[in-house]
Amino acid sequence: MKILGIETSCDDTSVAIYDKKLGLIDHQTLNQNSVHSKYHGIVPELAARSHLNQLNFLIKNIFSKYFLYNSSNFKKKFFKAVAYTVGPGLSGSIVVHSCRSIALSLDIPYILINHLEGHLLSVMLSYKKNLFPFLALLVSGANTQLIYAKYLGKYIILGQTLDDAVGNVFDYIAKILGLGFPGGKNLSDLAKYGISGKYFFPRPMTKYSNLNFSFSGLKTHVKNVILNSSDSFQEKSNIAKSFEEAIVDTLIIKCKLAIKKIKVKNFLVCGGVSSNRLLRIKLKKLIYKNQRKLYFSKKKFCTDNAGMIAYLGFLKYQQGMYSYNKSFSIYPNLLISDNINYL
C-alpha cells in the first residue's frame, strides 16, 4: 500500500511516497529561495506561481520514475490515496485543486492533512515508531507552540506565541543584520563568532507560570540595538549570539514548565527551528535532567516536506480517515487542535 503525499503550504514544493512495508521510498523537494531572496522574505503571489510550475515538474518526475505513465493497471494498484496539506499556510500556496485533480484522475480517495500535525508526526517518521502520548515543542517560521498529543488526531495546545513566531523573529533580525534569506541559519552561523555576555536581551514572559510566548518586544528591542551599534563583523556576531541565547533560554524555561505540568515520558521537537544547534544542546540537558526521552525530527524533515504528509496520510488511511467527496476547501488559519478528518 502506497500513499502519495503533497506539501505546498508556504514556499517549499514537495512530493513523497510512503509505503506500508518499505516506509518512505521517495521524497523530492524544491525550494523557492532564489525567487524570494532578493525580497528578504516570502512573497505570497510569487510563491503561489512557483508552486504550480514546481508541482507539475515533481509529479511528472515521480510518475516517470515509477513508470506510471502509459500504464493501464496502475490506477488502483500503485497509490491507495493522495494526502495533501489543506492548512495552515498561505492561501495561494495551498494548491488543493491540483491535488484533487490527481486523486480524481487516478480514481482514488484523498486525505486532508493538517500541516502542523504533519510536523508533529515527522518525528515518528524519523524514528519509525509510535511515540504517543507525548509533549511537543513546535517551532517554525509561523508557529511556536507547546502541545500535548494524546493520540493520533487529539492535540491540546498548552501554550503558544501571542504575536511573532520564533522562526519569523530569527528571519527579521537576520534581515536587520544584513544577512541573506532564509535568515535563521545565517544568523546562527554568525552567532558562533560572537562573545557571550556582550549584550543581555530579555527572556520575555518567563516570569509567568503560563506556557505562552511573546517575541514582538524582544524583536523591537534587538532591532534598536542593531541600529545603534557599529556595523563591524564582531559587533554583529555578538548581537546575534546574545539574541539566539535569549530565544533559546525562553524556549527552555517554558519547556521546563510544561514538563512539570504534563507527566508523559516522551518529549518531541519539530519544525524548522528545531534544527538549531544551541536549542538542541540545551534541550538535551533539560530532558536528561528530568529523566524523559527526547526525540528530534531528522534535519531533512525539520523544514516543510511531503515525507511527513505522506506518512501522516498513511496513518489516517489505516483508520479510514479518507474521502471521495468533491471538496476544494482550504484552511489557512487551521489550528493543530482542529479536526479536519471529515471536512
Swiss-Prot record:
GO molecular function: iron ion binding; N(6)-L-threonylcarbamoyladenine synthase activity
Keywords: Acyltransferase, Cytoplasm, Iron, Metal-binding, Transferase, tRNA processing
Catalytic activity: L-threonylcarbamoyladenylate + adenosine(37) in tRNA = N(6)-L-threonylcarbamoyladenosine(37) in tRNA + AMP + H(+)
EC numbers for this chain: 2.3.1.234
Enzyme class: transferase
Location(s) in or outside the cell: Cytoplasm
Cofactor binding notes: Binds 1 Fe(2+) ion per subunit.
GO cellular component, one term: cytoplasm
Gene3D superfamilies: 3.30.420.40
One GO BP: tRNA threonylcarbamoyladenosine modification
Highest rank taxon of the organism: Bacteria
Binding site for Fe cation: H115, H119, D304
Binding positions for substrate per the UniProt entry: L138, V139, S140, G141, A142, D171, G184, N276
Cofactor: Fe(2+)
HAMAP family, sorted: TsaD (MF_01445)
NCBIfam families with a match to the protein in the record: gcp_kae1, T6A_TsaD_YgjD
The protein's role, per its UniProt record: Required for the formation of a threonylcarbamoyl group on adenosine at position 37 (t(6)A37) in tRNAs that read codons beginning with adenine. Is involved in the transfer of the threonylcarbamoyl moiety of threonylcarbamoyl-AMP (TC-AMP) to the N6 group of A37, together with TsaE and TsaB. TsaD likely plays a direct catalytic role in this reaction.
PANTHER family, A to Z: TRNA N6-ADENOSINE THREONYLCARBAMOYLTRANSFERASE, TRNA N6-ADENOSINE THREONYLCARBAMOYLTRANSFERASE, MITOCHONDRIAL
Family note: Belongs to the KAE1 / TsaD family.
Protein name: tRNA N6-adenosine threonylcarbamoyltransferase
